Amino acid sequence: MKAIVYTSNTGSAAQYAALLAKETALPVYSLAEAVKKLPRGTEILYVGWLMAGTVKGYKKAAKRFAVQAVCAVGMFETGTQTEYVRKTNKLPPELPLFTLQGNLDRNKLHGLYRLMIDIMRKGVTKG
C-alpha cells in the first residue's frame, strides 16, 4: 500500500486514519486531497464512515484507486456488522474489511444526517 485515504463526517474516521498513518508511516489524505495528489490506480487503505451500512466515499475511491483494504467506522461495536457492510457495499470476499466503532457527536453532523439521528434518538428514548 502507498497511502491511507479517508472520508470522515464527525472526525472518527479521520482519527483512525491518522492513527494508522502513524503506525504504518504511510501518508494520509482525505479523499478530496487524494483525488488531486495521488495517481489513478494507487494502492490504498480506505477508511470511511458508515451511514445505514454504506461506507461513504468507497465507490469513488474504488473507481479511482486500487483499494487493498477497507476500514468502516460506525456506531456499532468494533468487529461487528462485517457481513452486512460487505453485502451493502458489494465488497469482494477477498478484500479485507474491518469495522470500527466511532464517536457520535451530534453537533458535528450536518443537515439530513443530524435530523435522522434526532429521529432515531427520539424513537429509542420513547420506549
Regions found by a protein language model. Name each.
Residues L50-G127:
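FMN-binding flavodoxin-like domain, especially the glycine-rich phosphate-binding loop
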Residues M1-R64:
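N-terminal beta1-alpha1-beta2 submodule of the flavodoxin-like/Rossmannoid cofactor-binding fold
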